[in-house]
């Protein structure tokens, strides 16, 4: 034993070699072989497995989906700052455009905790909710729209109204504003409101030439003092309507412009014939205590009207009353817009006519005020429907199939267009061939041609 100890002390290297040989010859039971080890760690190889990531292109799944990435790591994937920024906006807080917040056709661009709407022409605001041009839906104005110097929408209202708090709607500024039905039992019968379409306001006024200088022999019209197929109006439903009495009662109609003036057809009036105007009328054979009678003290036909040349060209006249009318729910003026808007309103496509005229061709006159909704007829169809001249200051309205029309005794009465609950004068009943005849239409004086003249002559002093 002493000898062994001496050998170990003198030859430590020998001992180490012996131990190493023993270990190498022993069977290893701690580690699995290569094949079995792979069965336990069965993990798919990654895209760049075996390579240094710093030297390969980034992978979106590896960089940002398996674990949260930084902007720089995302930049490695896209290799483009702009594309990385677009991805980053949604990656950080989701897609803010998912709810489609942009209105009126706006395009949404996502941002971090926010979004941006790219608005089409005519709109602005956070969600493109603000109209900035009158060309689109009248700028959301209830009545009139004008573009300011910086191309912003400025709404306005006709006389007797003021802008509401929203700067879009119009509200009454006087007790009985024009064009409004205020009798409670008839307010439910107000005709369907007309909503502004998209309009090209630059070209809204037709490029028409008034044929002022045409000389033409007097034409022989049949029954051209021209509501057939209409309905009984309720008291106060058309408070701007008046009836004219002269040699015979209810020979023509008219509309209240203001307390002192009536507008009617020029062919209705004769110099030297006494005319009485009755406002607030409903049943011409009954006294309903809503009527107001006034005498006409002055007749002003349009300066281009000449019955000797043509009885229905420039067929418009103004009547001055001896005493002002007292405005109330049964006696209310009709609204008159400017030339541009009167023309736009007419193009809405349908209007209402009213009167006490004959209820059928050569038949009896109506006792109760009649009204009828009539569609506008395109000019080409209008011209083809008659052998008589249709001037540019006239328009056609009615039904091709016949059966409904204005008729004798309705002449001078109103053709009105309702705009968001307020009625505007767009025409004056003038003439036609018979009444409600198939293929024939009622012919009306186009008020847009005469609004400046009306307003100039009827100013209240």
Swiss-Prot record:
Changing residue 228 to L: In HEMB; mild; Cardiff-2. The record marks 191-192, 226-227 as: Cleavage. It comes from Homo sapiens (Human). Residues 29-46, 192-226 form a propeptide. Changing residue 362 to E: In HEMB; moderate. This is Coagulation factor IX. Calcium binds to the gamma-carboxyglutamic acid (Gla) residues in the Gla domain. Calcium can also bind, with stronger affinity, to another site beyond the Gla domain. Under physiological ion concentrations, Ca(2+) is displaced by Mg(2+) from some of the gammaglutamate residues in the N-terminal Gla domain. This leads to a subtle conformation change that may affect the interaction with its binding protein. The gene is F9. Factor IX is a vitamin K-dependent plasma protein that participates in the intrinsic pathway of blood coagulation by converting factor X to its active form in the presence of Ca(2+) ions, phospholipids, and factor VIIIa. Transmembrane segments: none annotated. Ca(2+) 2 binds at residues 48, 53-54, 63, 73. The modification Phosphothreonine is found at residue 205. Changing residue 311 to T: Strongly increases enzyme activity with a synthetic peptide substrate. The lineage of its organism: Eukaryota, Metazoa, Chordata, Craniata, Vertebrata.
């Amino acid at each position: 034993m002493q000898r062994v100890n001496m050998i170990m002390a003198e030859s430590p290297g020998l001992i180490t070699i012996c131990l190493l040989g023993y270990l190498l010859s022993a069977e290893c039971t701690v580690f699995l072989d290569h094949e079995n080890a792979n069965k336990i760690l069965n993990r798919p190889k990654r895209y760049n497995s075996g390579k240094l990531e710093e030297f390969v292109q980034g992978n979106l799944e590896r960089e940002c989906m398996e674990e949260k990435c930084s902007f720089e790591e995302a930049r490695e994937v896209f290799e483009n700052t702009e594309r990385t920024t677009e991805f980053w906006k949604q990656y950080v807080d989701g897609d803010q455009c998912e709810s489609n917040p942009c209105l009126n056709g706006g395009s949404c661009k996502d941002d971090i905790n926010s979004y941006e709407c790219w608005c089409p022409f005519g709109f602005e605001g956070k969600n493109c909710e603000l109209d900035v041009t009158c060309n689109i839906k009248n700028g959301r104005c209830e009545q009139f729209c004008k573009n300011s110097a910086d191309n912003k929408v400025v709404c306005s209202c006709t006389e007797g109204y003021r802008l509401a708090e929203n700067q879009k709607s119009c509200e009454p500024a006087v007790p009985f504003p024009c064009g409004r039905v205020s009798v409670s039992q008839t307010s439910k019968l107000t005709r369907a409101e007309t909503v502004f379409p998209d309009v090209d306001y630059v070209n809204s006024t037709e490029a028409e030439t008034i044929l002022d200088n045409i000389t033409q022999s007097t034409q022989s019209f049949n029954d051209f003092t021209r509501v057939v197929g209409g309905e009984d109006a309720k008291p106060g439903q058309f408070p701007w309507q008046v009836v004219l009495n002269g040699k015979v009662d209810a020979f023509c109609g008219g509309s209240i412009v203001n307390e002192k003036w009536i507008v009617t057809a020029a062919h209705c009036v004769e110099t030297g014939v006494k005319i009485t105007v009755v406002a607030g009328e409903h049943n011409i054979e009954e006294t309903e205590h809503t009527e107001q009678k006034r005498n006409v003290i002055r007749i002003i036909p349009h300066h281009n009207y000449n019955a000797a040349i043509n009885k229905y060209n420039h067929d418009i006249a103004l009547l001055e009353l001896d005493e002002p009318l007292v405005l109330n729910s049964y006696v209310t003026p009709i609204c008159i817009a400017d030339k541009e808007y009167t023309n736009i309103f007419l193009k809405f496509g349908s209007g209402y006519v009213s009167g006490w005229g004959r209820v059928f061709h050569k038949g009896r006159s109506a006792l109760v005020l009649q009204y009828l909704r009539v569609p506008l007829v395109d000019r080409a169809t209008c011209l083809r429907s008659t052998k008589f001249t249709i001037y540019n200051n006239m328009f056609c309205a009615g039904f091709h199939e016949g059966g409904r029309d204005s008729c004798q005794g309705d002449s001078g009465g109103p053709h009105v267009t309702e705009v968001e609950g307020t009625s505007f004068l767009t025409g004056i009943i003038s003439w036609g061939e018979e009444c409600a005849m198939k293929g024939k239409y009622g012919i009306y004086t186009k008020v847009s041609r005469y609004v400046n003249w009306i307003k100039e002559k009827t100013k209240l002093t």
